[in-house]
């Protein structure tokens, strides 16, 4: 738990390579599935061309960008065993007068393959909550660090006023070596 963490700190702590294991519950079908993927999160500076382009796409002044990240994923889900891969750029824009809330610009949504802006808020416990409303789907995710190398995520998807899916992910940082015993 990282008390007092803001969005910039959260992005910085998220940078790196992660192994993600997901369990999803499809409530309408009463089915559960699991999946795994490798995530790569690369920090982008506010003057990175991808950050500037995304701000312009949303008619936002790039000077309002707090930071940026490129998130890439490569994984499989149990039900189809096909590769699911892609990437997106994320740019947080703080609400005026707030260090803890704002808009999160996305190059591409996860539930729909179109650009979408969501809302973010940082809790006093260091957890990041993301709310994204697509044309037909409402998505709410909560991400937090159990330790510097273990990130947890819960998410719900709602369609047409009812819950359709709930997920839990554990994400373990890759490439971390144990310190030598003294």
Swiss-Prot record:
Gene3D superfamilies, from UniProt?
A: 2.40.128.20
Task: Tell me which UniProt keywords the record has, alphabetically.
Answer: Lyase
Q: What class of enzyme is it?
A: lyase
What Pfam families is this protein classified in?
A: CpeS (PF09367)
Q: Which GO terms describe its molecular function?
A: lyase activity
Superkingdom is Bacteria
Query: EC number(s) in its UniProt entry?
Result: 4.-.-.-
Q: Does the keyword Lyase apply?
A: yes
Lyase among keywords: yes
| InterPro entries named in the record | Calycin, CpcS/CpeS
* Assigned protein family: Belongs to the CpcS/CpeS biliprotein lyase family.
Q: What does this protein do?
A: Covalently attaches a chromophore to Cys residue(s) of phycobiliproteins.
The molecule here is called: Chromophore lyase CpcS/CpeS
